[in-house]
Amino acid sequence: MKNKIDYSIYLVTDRDLMSTNTLEEAVEKSILGGTTLVQLREKECSSHDFYETALNVKKITQKYNIPLIINDRVDIALAVDADGIHIGQSDLPATVVRNIIGEDKILGVSAGNLDEALKAQKDGADYIGVGAMYSTGTKKDATSTTMNELREIMKKVSIPVVVIGGINKERIKDFNGINIDGLAIVSAIIAQENIEKSTRELKEEFDKLNTLI
């Protein structure tokens, strides 16, 4: 599965922002709109609740054959047999996580600059999440990554790159010609009143990239 992943529209969940009654409903609507990858991020809940939520979300992602990535929690990822794990710079080292999860699961690593991106690739990451590209309410302590830094990362790494941080429909065109592999999106999907429609519009804008003159 790892070699055939479509990173184009990468939903990162946030329970506090969702417009729906349940997280499962939000995830399913986003998939129907064109989400190609789902990362379950639960920062506040107990391990038991995270586990139960992950099992429920996995039923939906499996139904549509969409990979499920767990944020930070290697134990939860293994417990529910998720497709992969995404870690930040302050989490367990990527080399350690790779040893724990094995070669078959997807490993994503956040990187804010070229050095972090190169180290992530060297340490066994399957993809890199670069950002924050813009200021964002979901990660108030995230430092911003410039477009020039992104271009440099794209030149130097050979694994897929997704951008994250304040991505919305209007900003997608900023990435024209940079050849990113995907958009990791939080509020522009999960906080929208019509999640399916919003996701579809984001996918349409992403598909226009690199074709604009």
Swiss-Prot record:
Reaction it catalyzes: 2-[(2R,5Z)-2-carboxy-4-methylthiazol-5(2H)-ylidene]ethyl phosphate + 4-amino-2-methyl-5-(diphosphooxymethyl)pyrimidine + 2 H(+) = thiamine phosphate + CO2 + diphosphate; 2-(2-carboxy-4-methylthiazol-5-yl)ethyl phosphate + 4-amino-2-methyl-5-(diphosphooxymethyl)pyrimidine + 2 H(+) = thiamine phosphate + CO2 + diphosphate; 4-methyl-5-(2-phosphooxyethyl)-thiazole + 4-amino-2-methyl-5-(diphosphooxymethyl)pyrimidine + H(+) = thiamine phosphate + diphosphate
Keyword Metal-binding on entry: yes
Residues binding 2-[(2R,5Z)-2-carboxy-4-methylthiazol-5(2H)-ylidene]ethyl phosphate: 136-138, 166, 186-187
Necessary cofactors: Mg(2+)
Highest taxon listed in the record's lineage: Bacteria
Pathway annotation: Cofactor biosynthesis; thiamine diphosphate biosynthesis; thiamine phosphate from 4-amino-2-methyl-5-diphosphomethylpyrimidine and 4-methyl-5-(2-phosphoethyl)-thiazole: step 1/1
One Pfam family per UniProt: TMP-TENI
Xref: InterPro entries: Aldolase_TIM, ThiamineP_synth_sf, ThiamineP_synth_TenI, TMP_synthase
Binding site for Mg(2+): 72, 91
Enzyme class of the recorded protein, top EC level: transferase
Entry's cofactor comment: Binds 1 Mg(2+) ion per subunit.
Keywords: Magnesium, Metal-binding, Thiamine biosynthesis, Transferase
EC number: 2.5.1.3
Residues reported in the UniProt entry to bind 4-amino-2-methyl-5-(diphosphooxymethyl)pyrimidine: 39-43, 71, 110, 139
Transmembrane intervals: none
One cellular component term from this protein's GO annotations in UniProt: cytoplasm
Keyword presence, Protein biosynthesis: no
UniProt-listed GO biological process terms: thiamine biosynthetic process; thiamine diphosphate biosynthetic process
GO MF annotations in UniProt: magnesium ion binding; thiamine-phosphate diphosphorylase activity
NCBIfam families in the cross-refs: thiE (TIGR00693)
Function: Condenses 4-methyl-5-(beta-hydroxyethyl)thiazole monophosphate (THZ-P) and 2-methyl-4-amino-5-hydroxymethyl pyrimidine pyrophosphate (HMP-PP) to form thiamine monophosphate (TMP).
Family: Belongs to the thiamine-phosphate synthase family.
The protein, known as: Thiamine-phosphate synthase
Native organism: Clostridium botulinum (strain Eklund 17B / Type B)
Organism lineage string: Bacteria, Bacillati, Bacillota, Clostridia, Eubacteriales
